[in-house]
Every structure is written in C-alpha cells, then in structure tokens.
Amino acid sequence: FLPVNDSGIQDCDNGYIEIDGYCFYENDIAVLQTFIDNSYASGIDLGCEDYPSPSCGSPNPYMDAYSNVSIDGEYLNSLSSINNEIVEPLELGYQEWENGRLKGLMCGAFIYCSLSGEIPESISELTEIEVLRLEVNYFDGEIPESVCELENVNFDDYLSFDFSYNQLCPPYPDCIPDDAVEYMDTSECSYNGDINGDGMIDILDIIILVNMILDDEYNSIA
C-alpha cells in the first residue's frame, strides 16, 4: 500500500493512478481500457440471444465477477470494481504487475476474455510487458506494427507470446513467428491484388487484371 497524504488520499507518482490503494501506470491501464472499448464497440454476434449464458459477450461479462491480478507477488481477486456490470481494466484476464507496471497479460486459452475488434496501435505503450497471450479471441483487422516495439517480449516463446486462433488478417509484422499466428480465421480478410476474391493472389488474378485493362482500352477506342 501507499503512503496517505494529508487529505487521506493515497499518493502516486506522476503518470500513475491509484486504484484500491495501489499505484498503476496510467498508460498501461489505458491500453487495457482500449481493448475493452474496442470489444464493446465491435458489435460482434456471439449468439448470446439464442444461447444465453453469464459468460456470453465481448468482452466476457463474467470477468466482472472477479479479478485475477498479481501485484508485486500478492494475488488479488476482489478489487472494488467487481460486480458493477462493466468489465474494467483490472478485471481483464490474468495480469501480473510489478512496481506499478504491467508485466504480464494472459487473455487467451483457458481465460476466455472473448475480446473482439482491433488490437490497438497503442499496444506499444506496454513497454514493460514480458508476457502477452491473446490467443483464442475474436480480434479482427490487422496486427499493428507497433507490437514489434515491445522489447521485453520473447516473440519466439509461445508461452510468452501468442495471437493464434483469432480473425486477424495477414500480412503479419515481421517480428511475429508463424506459430504465434496459427489457426487464424482469415475468411473475412481481403487482400490487395486478390481480384477474384478467392483468398489468394495468383496467376488467375493477373489474367483477370490484364483482361480488365484490355477491355478498358478497347472501350476507349470503340
């Protein structure tokens, strides 16, 4: 816990905010909030009306019932924000914090965060993070190149980094190995140059493009 000032409020250094007597780096909290905001805004249909469940929704509404947060080695599962019908940053998956900085975020398999929408460009603000597991969610769009700025993440260790089983579209940033983006549903992705919409760029696209050019030239002469 933190020292109390004369007004009875916990003191945090500049750039940090106080939550339940602990200090958290504002930028880390802001990135977590963006994950949540993007999920609420995505409007993804998970069939919750047909198959109602306390854990059906994006983000997973059941996360509001508890928190899985480790702060300097102390495990907390009952922060004051629980059970207010809104998923908040410290309720998102399993988190590890040290000295007010987010060191690990596990929101993948067996956590069931059910996140959706785009991965925020601001993910690079998680400058101290070492573990980033976001597999088995509903993320779409592209993986931002800014993810490669996470200098403390071992991208080649699947226990430290995994984005598999999402709906993220290639090409993926060069820093990400193939096994971290396996089993991706790319059925809704569109590719520049994929003229016939078959999910591949090949000789058929070239033939179609040539024919389109020739047709345009013929029509301009006729």
What are these regions (language model features)?
Residues 37-40, 152, 211-218:
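Sec-exported extracytoplasmic/periplasmic mature domains
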Residues 43, 141, 216-220:
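Short loop/beta submotifs within extracellular cysteine-rich repeat domains
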Residues 102, 129, 140, 150-159:
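Conserved hydrophobic position(s) of the canonical leucine-rich repeat
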Residues 105-108, 130-134, 156-163:
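Conserved hydrophobic beta-strand positions in leucine-rich repeat
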Residues 116-124, 140-148, 171-174:
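The feature encodes a structural signal of leucine-rich repeats
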